[in-house]
Amino acid sequence: MSDKNLKEIISELLRLGYEGTYWDFKEDYTDCREDKLIDIICMANNIDGHQAYLIYGADDNGNVKGIEKTKYSRYTTKSVTEFLRSKPFAGDYIPKATVQTLEIENHELDIVIIKNTNNTPYYLTEAYSPSHDVKKKLYAGAIYT
């Protein structure tokens, strides 16, 4: 997909002003690894069977805020891939994701693109809870959407 096509797709999703089954707006990154993982799994398992987008730098209504001043480490394709590969996914099938940065409304947005594959649903074979917060724990065998 060319940057222009991606920019058109993301601009249209932002204009809608709401989140959907295959796109989610994130105003900023988080350091909570459970939140990072569940966001990617949910998008990878979207019920539309569509390529999915985590759009960092926009609020829940699609208003562009920018991600350039985040205090957190920004995602790269390498960092997302390494993060996912280190998790206990069933069948060793991991979501396929890439990261691209776009400039929209004079701000940078980081877009995590989660590819649509035939390997869904993605789920873990072991519980995942590095923060030890029971409210954030991802459970083995659970299908998150």
Q: For each predicted feature, which ranges?
A:
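Conserved N-terminal catalytic/coupling substructures associated with nucleotide/phosphate chemistry
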Residues: M1-T145
